[in-house]
Amino acid sequence: MSDSSAPDLPSKPSSLNAGQSSSLQTTNTGIGMGSGMGSGMGMGTYGNSYGSSYGGGYGSSMYGSGGYGMGGYGSSMYGGSRYGMGSYGMGGYGMGGYGMGMNTGMNGMGMAGSLAQGSEATFQLIESIIGAVGGFAQVLEATYMATHSSFFTMISMADQLSHLKTALGSMLGIYTVINWLKRIMGKLMGVKNKLTPDEFRKFQEKQMKKLSNSNNTGGPNKNTNKLSLKPLLLFLAAVVGFPYLLKKLIAHLAETSQMNGNFITSGGSLQGNLDPTKLEFARALYDFNPENEEMELKLARGELMAILSKTEPNSNQESTWWKCRSRDGKVGFVPYNYVEIIERHQRPVPEAQEEPAAAVLAERQQQPIIDSTEFQKMKT
């Protein structure tokens, strides 16, 4: 083959770099979210006071490993900031103020430091009470705002209903005016608008006659109470037919997706119907460990593979990374200089097989043709 030292990898196409950068971007996004949320809670309006107090306190170690030290309330207002390392520690009475010259020395553990350390728990308790009261005040404020907004919403709705009432009244007033005009026209023309008892009695007698005639003859509404089977048949068809059609549809979709999945897995989505007689095969010259196992194919020295494509998927140009398929069915890209193409040796078609057939044909053509007289002589 060649020497054992593997050559340098060629430059990757844009499709491989895009897949690798997307995975790295996902990882960096997770790191950014973690660091951003961690630092944002501590560096807010109150600095490390409420940030580290409620962030690291209730989140990681309030009374555990942090206690009132760096994790719980230590890094808050009265821990590492005011009475710890800030004001009365190394800054106030420690090294800066009265540390080196008077009382506390390098460590800041004099009278002021001991008082600050002793009163730290009390101030932290007061701080937690103030925080709880502040939270309760925020809840009350939110409740008040919700009640206020809902109250004014109801007022605006009542106002809109009053406008609707006015609009409906004006619309119904038109019909009132029309009825009033009809009455005036009836009075002018002598039409009686009021129904007299005699007229009502006549109307009632006519209705009774119509009802008796319909009961005797059957009438036009004879089959009104007969039950119809159409709603029942439609209901049964919907109950039985809809699940059947849905099952057929799901089976068809599953079969289609399975065929597409097999087609993509076999590499047919990019290469179409591959002809095995026209495929090129290659042998790995060196071991290759891919950086992105989803896009690249791992190679072992001497491994055989089939070359599916030598072009880039996006631009269809000649690429330095070839798409190959291994014996176990895995598909991926490999560098072109890590493999060698296996040349096929075509067997020549032997011409000796055609010579006997040609000789037999020539002999048959040279044989004399027997006519009818010679055939009669041969019979006698």
From Swiss-Prot:
Give compartment(s). Answer: Peroxisome membrane
Is Transport among this UniProt entry's keywords? yes
Please list the GO biological process terms of this entry. Answer: protein import into peroxisome matrix, docking
Q: Where is this region: Disordered?
A: 1-30
Q: Where is the composition biased (Polar residues)?
A: 12-30
Task: Spell out which residues lie on the membrane's Cytoplasmic side.
Answer: 252-380
Q: Which domain of life is it from?
A: Eukaryota
**Start and end of every SH3 domain?**
277-344
Per the UniProt topology annotation, the Lumenal ranges are 1-230
Listed GO cellular component terms? peroxisomal importomer complex; peroxisomal membrane
The effect annotated for residue 291 to K is: Abolishes activity
Its function, per the record, reads: Component of the PEX13-PEX14 docking complex, a translocon channel that specifically mediates the import of peroxisomal cargo proteins bound to PEX5 receptor. The PEX13-PEX14 docking complex forms a large import pore which can be opened to a diameter of about 9 nm. Mechanistically, PEX5 receptor along with cargo proteins associates with the PEX14 subunit of the PEX13-PEX14 docking complex in the cytosol, leading to the insertion of the receptor into the organelle membrane with the concomitant translocation of the cargo into the peroxisome matrix.
Description of how the protein assembles with itself and partners: Interacts (via SH3 domain) with PEX14 (via SH3-binding motif); forming the PEX13-PEX14 docking complex.
The identity of this protein, by name, is Peroxisomal membrane protein PEX13
Query: Coding gene?
Result: PEX13
